[in-house]
Regions:
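Cleavable N-terminal export/targeting peptides
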Residues: 1-26
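Solvent-exposed loop/turn segments connecting transmembrane beta-strands
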Residues: 24-41, 63-69, 171-173
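Gram-negative (and chloroplast) outer-membrane scaffold detector with strong preference
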Residues: 40-137, 141, 182-183
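Outer-membrane beta-barrel and related beta-rich outer-membrane complex signature
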Residues: 103-105, 147-151
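Long, low-complexity, acidic Ser/Pro- and Gly-enriched intrinsically disordered regions
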Residues: 123, 150-152, 180
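Solvent-exposed loop segments that connect transmembrane elements
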Residues: 149-164
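C-terminal beta-signal and terminal closure region of outer-membrane beta-barrel proteins
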Residues: 160-174
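Outer-membrane beta-barrel "beta-signal"
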Residues: 171-185
Length: 185
């Protein structure tokens, strides 16, 4: 995975001269939210690509599931209707792979791995100091498979975890809204 991310990063840096941008344009942006971090590269005025990584920990406390932890790494593409470095509506696609661990009330853990694709309709505000804020929401689809389980009792909580994973596989509106603060350079 490290080699894949390094390759993507090098491609982003080395393709800059192919798109005819002036050296004064802001080509890169670092973005962060509470649980994810990204580096993006502007291909031109309206298109950007990048990669991101993060970890989201959620206290669930329902259906015998105490908490869930999701670690992920992925790539993203964004299209801004006006421009990336101005106030504009945009469409973002995010494709990630990751691991999810669920802990049940009896202390059992269930580990899943898989991938997720999100499509986000967003609006971004770009400020004169090169800071930006992006807020959006949209559908998500994921495919998960159980990797392992560590049972502490025979209460059958694994079925509750499977039901939750199935419920989260397709969400017409993602349960996690898209929010990022960024700096362009």
């Amino acid at each position: 995975m490290k080699n894949l991310l390094t390759t993507i990063f090098l491609i982003l840096i080395l393709t800059s001269p192919l798109f005819g941008q002036s050296s004064e344009d802001k080509k890169f942006a670092v973005r962060t939210s509470i649980f994810a971090h990204a580096l993006t590269y502007n291909l031109d005025k309206q298109n950007g690509v990048g990669f991101y990584f993060g970890q989201l920990s959620t206290d669930i406390n329902e259906d015998n599931i105490e908490k869930g932890v999701n670690s992920f790494v992925g790539v993203n593409y964004g299209y801004a209707f006006d421009c990336i470095n101005c106030d504009s509506f945009s469409i973002l696609t995010l494709l990630s792979t990751g691991n999810a661990t669920f802990t049940t009330d009896d202390g059992s853990t269930y580990n899943y791995s898989g991938w997720v694709i999100n499509v986000v309709g967003a609006y971004g505000w770009y400020f004169e100091n090169d800071l930006s804020v992006i807020l959006g929401i949209g559908p998500s689809y994921g495919s998960w498979s159980k990797e392992s389980e560590n049972l502490k009792s025979d209460k059958g909580y694994g079925k509750d975890v499977e039901d939750r994973v199935k419920k989260l596989s397709f969400q017409p509106i993602s349960s996690t809204p898209f929010f990022a603060i960024g700096y362009s350079f």
